[in-house]
Amino acid sequence: MTGANRHYVLAAGGTGGHLLPAFALAAELDRRGHHVALITDERGAKIPGKPDFLPAHVIPAGRFGKNPLRWVGGLRAVWKGREMAKRLFESFQPSAVVGFGGYPALPAMLAASREDIPSIIHEQNAVLGRVNRLQAGRVSAIATAYPEIQRLKPKHAEKIHLVGNPVRAGVLSLRDEPFPPFTEDGLLKVLVTGGSQGASVLSQIVPDGLAMLPPALRQRLQVTQQCRPEDLDTVRERYKTHDIPAELGSYFEDMAARLADAHLFIGRAGASTIAELTAVGRPAILVPLPIATDDHQAHNTREVVKAGGARMIRQEKFTPKELAKQIQALGQRPDTLATAAHAAWNCGRPKAVEDLADLVESFGGADMMDVIKVGGNNARAASQGVAVGQGAAKERAE
């Protein structure tokens, strides 16, 4: 979709889960000739991966907890942030504002509503986040990553557009990489990560779980594991004790290539993680973060687990014995992992960033098409499991 150069503002919370999809959209809008600005908080401005062309405007954003005193301070910060966002809008004149959730996105979304600027929210998870729930009734469109979204009211169904989660170009470039050859006597390459901060539970359980595999399978293991820096020495010693070859690190710059080279992934169930797994098509054993808000990581796994592309183990049941059982079931026959990889690949939405950009472009410009076809087939998501009729986003004139 093409058209006159426009200005767009993206607003996202200060974590990679919110910002990485925003960075991907910014790159796509820039490629189409538009001007883009980012609103976030101090944490968000430091997240790696921000495109060089993208200016980051840091504004205050309140945090709210159970303590009423924190609400007072939080509301003051939101009001101050909203006023700062309004001043940015006056000079930048955005055609639309896109929110990716997280409290730092709230002031900008409130300012857009106040100034009658078209706005869109993108929900990365299978449960609508708190800030996006607050804005669902005010925005022009709701872009979702999963066919079914919890905590999204049916009355907002006509706003919903299923686009998927944008992923990095480096990951998308590997979508057509075939599943690595896996034979009955070949290496079983396992990639283990715990998200951007690592996960100590994986460091504690995975080495011992791999050690419980039958000798014929254990001797074929080749492990790559991302750990917290403070866990590296302990985990290295565990693998050495079990005589399992393992490459460990707190950060891998070539993570996308390592994912493409893996036969099996073990890790958390964040939205970006699942989007990348399904983009490349690699089977997984997923351990949802138990303290994730509204248990959204467990909900994130449902589509790919149902399709056969992954297995999910709740953390309270994540023991070395259970992990070994699941790996053995997947790794005993070469075709089992390959079939799971194909199922994961089929869950991928490689055109997510293009479809989201099409949706964003449909607001604020008279030269846009009357109707856009998200995903090529007018894809719609379902709110709270209620099926939503097919349709598309209608043009919004300035």
From Swiss-Prot:
It holds the Pfam family Glyco_transf_28. The keyword Glycosyltransferase applies. Pathway: Cell wall biogenesis; peptidoglycan biosynthesis. One of its GO terms (biological process) is lipid glycosylation. It is an enzyme of class 2 (transferase). It is a peripheral membrane protein. Its EC number is 2.4.1.227. Gene3D superfamilies: Glycogen Phosphorylase B (3.40.50.2000). It is found in: Cell inner membrane. UDP-N-acetyl-alpha-D-glucosamine binds at T15, G16, G17, N125, R168, S196, Q297. Keywords: Cell cycle, Cell division, Cell inner membrane, Cell membrane, Cell shape, Cell wall biogenesis/degradation, Glycosyltransferase, Membrane, Peptidoglycan synthesis, Transferase. Cell wall formation. Catalyzes the transfer of a GlcNAc subunit on undecaprenyl-pyrophosphoryl-MurNAc-pentapeptide (lipid intermediate I) to form undecaprenyl-pyrophosphoryl-MurNAc-(pentapeptide)GlcNAc (lipid intermediate II). Belongs to the glycosyltransferase 28 family. MurG subfamily. This is UDP-N-acetylglucosamine--N-acetylmuramyl-(pentapeptide) pyrophosphoryl-undecaprenol N-acetylglucosamine transferase. It comes from Erythrobacter litoralis (strain HTCC2594).
